[in-house]
Amino acid sequence: MQSVIAQAKRIVVKVGSSLVTNDGKGLDHDAIARWAAQIARLRVAGKEVVLVSSGAIAEGMQRLGWARRPKEIHELQAAAAVGQMGLAQVYESQFTRYGIRTAQVLLTHADLADRERYLNARSTLLTLLSLGVVPIINENDTVVTDEIKFGDNDTLGALVTNLIEGDALVILTDQRGLYTADPRKDPAAQFVDEALAGTPELEAMAGGAGTSIGRGGMLTKILAAKRAAKSGAHTTIASGREANVLERLAAGEAIGTQLLAPTGRLTARKQWMADHLQLRGRVVIDGGAVEKLTSGGKSLLPIGVVEVQGEFARGEVIACVDAQGKEVARGITNYSSAESRLIARKPSSEIESVLGHLNEPELIHRDNLVLV
């Protein structure tokens, strides 16, 4: 078995907090120097690399003299603001040794939820790569709230992979990879060398939350791989404690767990819709509509809508859920929530008489709809 990273041209590398900090007590400059050296050699080998690095909050805690990770979001935001300065400085100084320029890019969910800002972020990152710059990405913790956070840098890494149409996502952690069960509790646990991303059984195998330093457990990594696979990107989850792990992966050595993407990728527009983490509203659809969307590739008509939940405007991305609340699709709505409530359960021929105007005969056109 060969590493899927070997054939990848554009790679997103996510490095966890435990791999760039001294057990949460500030940044580990020597460790960051090693990551910079490996990425520099990947660049020489012709690969484009985007780095998603944790460590800002841990560095901020050290600079502020805090022994424990705070729970209040305003304190976490303050620590991130202080620590982000140090994180950028250390990476810049290390990459400069190899003649490589770095760029700090801080993103929020709002940046990726808004279509124009999404395209601007994509354009900026692709321009940086074309200039030979290594973008170093983190969430803009200073301005986000719990309700609009990516949640962890594993998710952010997957979203960035999709944003730039990366070939592979490498999630480096302090664990070897994925096991069928927690090996610390189950002696019969087997290591998973390779699996198909998005397989339901993988989520059952994954453990709970991460450490006190970081936020991401194995489950977030499994879900990140599932998300990255939608754009056709493969994911490797491997231990960052392995010597020269990035170079060895790039050389074809199979290290860690490889989660392979199914054949095919979503169009850029549908990928953007699929990557929304928070939606303003949703519509409950009947069984017939579920069948038409999932098997027939049809548009969603108002007659198939049972209930409209939330408040949204025309042009926003909303979810389509079945009677049990399971999301089956999402897409760009042609009508606001108020209008949708008025035309729900009605044939398209009655839309104009009910609303006084007709935007489109569909609530969501199939070209603006993606299955999830």
Curated annotation (Swiss-Prot):
The family this protein is said to belong to: Belongs to the glutamate 5-kinase family.
Query: What positions does the entry give for ATP binding?
Result: 14, 173-174
Q: Which residues bind substrate?
A: 54, 141, 153
The record's listing under PANTHER family reads: GLUTAMATE 5-KINASE (PTHR43654), ISOPENTENYL PHOSPHATE KINASE (PTHR43654:SF1)
- Name its cellular compartments: Cytoplasm
Q: What class of enzyme is it?
A: transferase
Q: What is this protein called?
A: Glutamate 5-kinase
Source organism of the structure: Cupriavidus taiwanensis (strain DSM 17343 / BCRC 17206 / CCUG 44338 / CIP 107171 / LMG 19424 / R1) (Ralstonia taiwanensis (strain LMG 19424))
Pathway in which this enzyme or protein is active:
Amino-acid biosynthesis; L-proline biosynthesis; L-glutamate 5-semialdehyde from L-glutamate: step 1/2
Q: Does the keyword S-adenosyl-L-methionine apply?
A: no
GO annotation (BP), single: L-proline biosynthetic process
Q: Name one Pfam family in it.
A: AA_kinase
Q: Which gene encodes it?
A: proB
Q: PUA domain location, by residue?
A: 280-358
Enzyme Commission number(s): 2.7.2.11
The taxonomy runs: Bacteria, Pseudomonadati, Pseudomonadota, Betaproteobacteria, Burkholderiales
Role summary: Catalyzes the transfer of a phosphate group to glutamate to form L-glutamate 5-phosphate.
